[in-house]
């Protein structure tokens, strides 16, 4: 049974910003409070991850001391009773949408999120971080090998060249042998699942699934990306799509804001702290994900509509220690040529043959950098 999202909101989240605003404007009218489409918390407003996920309440930090609410329909009777007993604060209470409150709370915490994205891993788990490119042991090992090669070449140059070539030949032969093994394994593999994800169909049985898409200088790809993500076969109220944009990339920000109109997709602006890289953008967004599962796509990706259901079904059938799945990536070119066909063959060999045999042998898998699915976030 899927875990329930503790921050799950009613279905208006999935209907788009316009419908969401209309719903909360009506709730403001029923409460006798003002509705505001945008939330201004001022400088130094308090914000934490739980408040961002809930997106039901925020307090401004300036002299106005305004309180912004995004009440569920079921909460309205209790709020009316509270207002009747406490009429004085009514003027400082405003109703807004969860999207507007969430955006304001993220903005209030963005410096902390950005700082954590840059340094949290290297501080907490330095051996898993790439901030230090070469360790002391690696540097010493490299120097030792170089010294041995230089010494051997000075004493017996011909024998050294032969030895280096033999070692290289063995390594290249190993790669070739792996591909032959992979080809034989692929020929014996059963066909892929025909009924993708049919083990789970009811929306109530599905968890919230987060989709992260980091973008940089890719404004021309945004419309096609949004159309492809809109076709994903997953209940829209249980889909958490976040487009991650750099604050200096104005063209892509403008294209994204235009493309996501009428959807529940969220735009996250990554502050200009540290490097403008895909890992930093993903680390910035990860604490804000609502989903128990998360996948990463690139701007040029056009995921199969059934990919999330297939991934979730695979997680359900897999041992609990399986935390990541790599989807197959198929290369498509609008104007194919010889080079693009060779590229497509290379990708097909990797994702349809080499990676499956590495998985069957229990060996480490090189991830493709996109279409990776992760579980166990909640």
Task: Enumerate the predicted regions with their spans.
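Long helical/loop segments within the catalytic core of UDP-sugar-dependent glycosyltransferases
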Residues: 260-264, 269-287, 305-378
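Acidic donor-binding segment of Leloir-type glycosyltransferases
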Residues: 230-274, 316
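Short aromatic/hydrophobic "clamp" motif used to bind/position activated sugar donors
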Residues: 294
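N-terminal signal-anchor transmembrane helix
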Residues: 177-211, 215-238
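The conserved acidic donor/metal-binding loop of glycosyltransferases
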Residues: 298-302
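Extended, hydrophilic extramembrane loops/domains of integral membrane proteins
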Residues: 83-119
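N-terminal membrane-anchoring/stem segments of glycan-assembly enzymes
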Residues: 107-203
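Polyanionic, low-complexity intrinsically disordered segments
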Residues: 13-85
